[in-house]
Amino acid sequence: MCKGRRNTFSKSTSACEIVYRILENWSTGNENFVKEFEKTVDRVLENCYDGHGQRNDCGVRRLKMEKNMKSKIVVDSSANVYELPDVGFACVPLKILTDEQEYVDTAEVDAPALAEMMRTYKGRTSTSCPNISDWMAAYEGADEVYVVTITGTLSGAYNAALLAGEEYEQSHEDARVFVLDSLSTGAESRLLVERLAALIKAGKPFDTVCEEIRAYHEHTHLLFALESLANLARNGRVKPAVAAVARMLGIRVIGQASDAGDLEVLCKTRGEHGALERMVLEMKAHGLTNGRVHIDHCCNAAAAERLKHMVHAVFPEAKVEVGSCGALCSYYAEYGGLMVGYEDSEAPTV
């Protein structure tokens, strides 16, 4: 028996301490203890639900912290996010394959050098997604797992992550796994990952996080401007003839991720300035006002910064950040490419 322990509960009493005192006092017929325990049960109900029987997220947050549930965000490397501070996080790499070498898309890969090499490479190239065991290993150690994958139309990553989630839940009692097909890649996926982190830090319960990230996803978008379509053609994403004509005429292709997750060509332009102008017009047409914008570039920092200034000229309150593509996005965006993820004006806040 632990001496000096008072048989009362306070708002700071931990769940473990409550259980210990139940075992210690319940069989003794301690009436004061029973009364305090009943008060604690009332506190739990009061914390979890309001007067109308609806879930009280703030109360759930307090009890969740007592239980010490471990949350983790898991993303494949197409999001160009390799680390995330202040929240459980894992990045599962995709791979770029050539006849001579395999490149694992981690933060250590020299993505600009890879993009430069691909400009003149004549051999076969392809990409491969993480398998089920890769995803399972990334989920390990978490009770609540939130996953964001590259669009299922480009990769099998989503299906593998989904199957891994089912296995993880079966082998880990009380674990829950939510898998979101971004229907996109790159900068838009990064927006989703960062919103997940904000929801977790806010102490939202699992079901609420899932519901709110789905709602947020309805208001995020991806644009891209590509100088070359060679690797997309090699992997069957566009017709080789289209890629050849674009290369010969020096055409830049402006496109977007469609609602179905396909890469959809919007227009073709000549010259960088025209391409950037069209991207700003597309963002305006889709409702960008003062939201967040992520610009990722492949060996084209000058164009990315120029686009940032053009966005601010039209939307002074927009929150614009510039980053670089990782290996997988560099492979598809190719040398000089830009990928832009942005929120529209109806994007919900945390």
Model-predicted segments: where are they?
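Polybasic, low-complexity intrinsically disordered segments
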Residues: M1-F9, E17-Y20
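Basic polycationic patches enriched in arginine
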Residues: R5-R6, R21, R43, R55, ...
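Intrinsic disorder/low-complexity segments
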Residues: N7-S10, T28-N30
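Short, positively charged and aromatic/hydrophobic N-terminal segments
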Residues: E17-E24, E31-D50
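Class I S-adenosyl-L-methionine
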Residues: Q101-Q170
